[in-house]
């Protein structure tokens, strides 16, 4: 499912003394089946943009098109349930939203709230519990008896049970250790590929943006500064650092190497293998 934002703007408490501009003239599209990342410093508008993707927030200027549904600023919208069923959002610390007596009931809550029968919802729960790396026996347990990592997977299963066409991830690995983060990100990537999802990742991790995204949207103060491939965006690491952002370790090491040997590699490397190949000729002759 394709998503397109055109001249999108948003103000909190518009036309009041407390009006605050959050987004301004945002123009970006997310192709069907693509994996995109949105990066930017805290307060850049990432999460506000994210909440427009399933109409949790409505634009105050411009429009957003999700599939065949168009949402235009100032136009009253009806039947948003269908849109919200197609766009699943995994927020930071999603486990905080667990509340039911059992894991099964928690996973079934969303689908049943959108009109799925209890029987079909239970079938979905049995399917998605495996998709998040857990087993069926956990369905009868209380979610509050589980480990933190298991609780997060259960919460993610609840989103997947809605059978979304678009998956929006808002810092989905917040609070996890490096191993847990890698497991969760690999899980999302596999789901993205297997289901043909349109995936939008909001992240502070430049490593994840470089590793998984096909396209990166760089934001500052509610506006889009750059849209490009990871290689294009990370080709100017100093500009990212000036914005208060980090860069992937491989990109940082490439910069150190180029300065030390006074050379310029042929491309911005995103993996260790790429960097090793690019460095090899210089290392073989002991530098430039």
Swiss-Prot record:
Per UniProt, which keywords does this protein have?
A: ATP-binding, Cell membrane, Membrane, Nucleotide-binding, Translocase, Transport
Q: Which SMART domains match?
A: AAA (SM00382)
Subcellular location, principal: membrane
The residue ranges of the ABC transporter domain are: 3-246
Q: Which PROSITE patterns match?
A: ABC_TRANSPORTER_1 (PS00211), ABC_TRANSPORTER_2 (PS50893), CBIO (PS51246)
Bilayer topology: Peripheral membrane protein
Annotated GO MF terms: ATP binding; ATP hydrolysis activity; ATPase-coupled transmembrane transporter activity; cobalt ion transmembrane transporter activity
Per its UniProt record, what InterPro entries does this chain match? Answer: AAA+_ATPase, ABC_transporter-like_ATP-bd, ABC_transporter-like_CS, ABC_transpr_CbiO/EcfA_su, ECF_ABC_transporter_ATP-bd, EcfA2, P-loop_NTPase
Q: Which top-level group of life is the source organism from?
A: Bacteria
Q: Name one GO biological process term.
A: cobalt ion transport
Localization in the cell: Cell membrane
Q: Which GO terms describe its cellular component?
A: ATP-binding cassette (ABC) transporter complex
Q: What is its EC number?
A: 7.-.-.-
Q: Where does ATP bind?
A: 40-47
Please name the PANTHER family in this protein's record: ENERGY-COUPLING FACTOR TRANSPORTER ATP-BINDING PROTEIN ECFA2, HEAVY METAL TRANSPORTER
Task: State the oligomer form and interacting partners.
Answer: Forms a stable energy-coupling factor (ECF) transporter complex composed of 2 membrane-embedded substrate-binding proteins (S component), 2 ATP-binding proteins (A component) and 2 transmembrane proteins (T component).
The record's function comment reads: ATP-binding (A) component of a common energy-coupling factor (ECF) ABC-transporter complex. Unlike classic ABC transporters this ECF transporter provides the energy necessary to transport a number of different substrates.
Similarity annotation: Belongs to the ABC transporter superfamily. Energy-coupling factor EcfA family.
- What is the protein's given name? Energy-coupling factor transporter ATP-binding protein EcfA2
Q: Which organism is it from?
A: Listeria monocytogenes serotype 4b (strain F2365)
State the encoding gene. ecfA2
């Amino acid at each position: 499912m394709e998503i397109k934002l055109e001249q999108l703007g948003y103000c909190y408490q518009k036309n009041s003394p407390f009006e605050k501009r959050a987004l301004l003239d945002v123009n970006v599209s997310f192709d069907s089946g693509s994996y995109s990342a949105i990066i930017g410093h805290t307060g850049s508008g990432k999460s506000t943009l994210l909440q427009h993707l399933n109409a949790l927030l409505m634009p105050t200027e411009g429009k957003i098109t999700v599939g065949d549904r168009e949402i235009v600023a100032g136009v009253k919208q009806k039947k948003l349930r269908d849109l919200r069923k197609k766009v699943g959002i995994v927020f930071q610390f999603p486990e905080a939203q667990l509340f039911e007596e059992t894991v099964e009931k928690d996973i079934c809550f969303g689908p049943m709230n959108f009109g799925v029968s209890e029987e079909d919802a239970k079938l979905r729960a049995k399917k998605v519990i495996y998709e998040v790396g857990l087993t069926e026996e956990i369905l009868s347990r209380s979610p509050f008896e589980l480990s933190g990592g298991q609780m997060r997977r259960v919460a993610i299963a609840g989103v997947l049970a809605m059978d979304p066409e678009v998956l929006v991830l808002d810092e989905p690995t917040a609070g996890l250790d490096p191993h847990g983060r890698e497991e969760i990100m690999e899980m999302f990537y596999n789901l993205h590929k297997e289901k043909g999802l349109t995936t939008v990742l909001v992240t502070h991790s430049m490593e994840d943006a470089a590793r998984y995204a096909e396209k990166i949207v760089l934001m500052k103060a509610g506006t889009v500064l750059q849209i490009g491939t990871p290689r294009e965006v990370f080709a100017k690491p100093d500009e990212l650092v000036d914005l208060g952002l980090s860069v992937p370790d491989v990109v940082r090491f490439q910069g150190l190497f180029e300065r030390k040997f006074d050379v310029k590699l042929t491309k911005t490397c995103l993996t260790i293998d790429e960097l090793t190949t690019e460095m090899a000729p210089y290392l073989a002759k002991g530098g430039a």
